[in-house]
């Protein structure tokens, strides 16, 4: 009995100790006020983030937040300058020596502690709470109404530590003439000043960047837009949101030459023949913004997107740039920091400037080298070992929207997420880790591509671990709900796959900025009647599924569904119908009325887009950017040449279907979504049976990317152990082959090989350089 009493007593004591030692959960209840402790000395970006969190708490929990300097349910602070964090009782050592990092942790007494390694980290930590509440970064920009909650709870064991993979992460608003500029200037922030995009608009953009954990902004710079720094209130808005201001390849020293030279410059924008005036133009701007967080672009091109004036040869241009570097860095040393190596600077070898760089241009060691894609998603240069070792590091400027040759893609933002992932992962692995900037056009409708890009820049390992499909799935679930996402995920995958084969903007088989006007005439694509009908049927299925799935979307997310899914998918469907039915009609195989009806559908869809949310997005969506011929109603005429004949392959494989070899399948990439990377020195083997022919034509179809190391991109082909044939397929920018490649998203090489009478044959394709990505292999009998 005595032992039993002792045992019961000890058990009771153990329970008491257990209860007393149990860590409390962090809990917020609907309608209950939330106290947030934060020092008044924190940076503006921290205060801004707290304002956004307060708004989110009100939306989700109907809870009013109060900011206090001493106590609260939530404790916020930056290490090294916040006593609140020092006294919070959590281990913050993991934050030391990190940039823009944050930690979220529930303390023993059930308080949520938000600690940042610097002000940006603290801000991102605050808005991580908004993410945990279920608030999408696209809450305002895509009308993703947050779901109401009765309770918000985090376990007492909750710990979260995050820091960026890439230091500077941001967007470039570009080609804004038909979307963001008129929408801002006439709808969202009406102004009597022509082309003004003011601080109200920019604050919305900066809020989006902050919620996406981005920190860098290249503002709109076309001639139609009043330059950012000439618009009252814009600079202050950037400071409020902790945004680093940068500028594109043709805007050195934070000067928008396209919009400002005619206002503030004198004479020609020519450093050879009018150097003092150009120097003064730059000097005036540096003096104005010396106290702002600026990433200064060095170098010089033309006033807009063209070559520099006054220097004709590459050697002359190189000499001018060497002089420009010295003078520009002298200005930074004079007005910004006497130690110029402490001023963030970037050099962007875009288009013809890359040729100057390759000719031996010496860029100062502390300047970031920013490499570019070819405007169609394929990065032109990856840093060498020497370039990776530079103090300034490496960056990338990447496009999901573009105006230029061979054809614009400004409308529907159909860049393959799988291509973005493959190229940006390769960029990171090759040492491009300092700065990532995405040309996003008008932001809408590139929402998903923007988030994928920013998520990779923030935490590349996480995106890499889950894969593109899972990332898209989670995004759709957050924006539209689990039920809808399950139905729409395969729709969006197929939407991107079909557009990878041919973007909606390229369906007229036209080209822009060519001397011969025949390129602007809508004409047949080199597709057979069977190929056309298969594509039409595929799009019809997508459109029908999207229409039916709308019933699964909550009423308060219907606008989001239209913006993120219905408009892009159905507009792409109708664009394909318009051009492909016209192609069939030219050959008397369809009625012209079907093409005209598709045009009318595009117009109606766009009108509805611009009427959403009581006209909130009026003027944002234009289905005829630049009024290119491909966007018009198709002119009725008869074909003058027969339609492409159907050609059936004896055998066909995608990259993943190799019988032997280490195929690194690129998830969702390519014509069939199963392209495969072949590492240098590795080979893939494809097997086929006996054919009634003595020779075969082998069509090898690859991703039209650029060399990873050096200037070569080669593979070899061998049949049945014969001597391998070496084939190169690298292209020069703006060459005819490059234009064809980016329009069809394939580089094609053909070779005829002899076949013996063996019952089984082995076709071996071996990568001789890094970067070979095999999409498809076609085998045709040669009669």
Where do the protein language model's features map onto the residues?
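Bacterial Sec-dependent N-terminal signal peptides
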Residues: 1-24
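Structured mid-domain segments that build the active-site/substrate or prosthetic-cofactor binding neighborhood
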Residues: 210, 215-218, 225, 233, ...
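C-terminal non-catalytic alpha-helical accessory regions
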Residues: 144, 148-150, 472-626, 684
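Extracytoplasmic
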Residues: 622-783
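Contiguous, structured surface segment used for ligand recognition
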Residues: 21-163
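The substrate-binding groove and active-site-proximal loops of carbohydrate-active enzymes
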Residues: 113-116, 177-199, 215-225, 261-277, ...
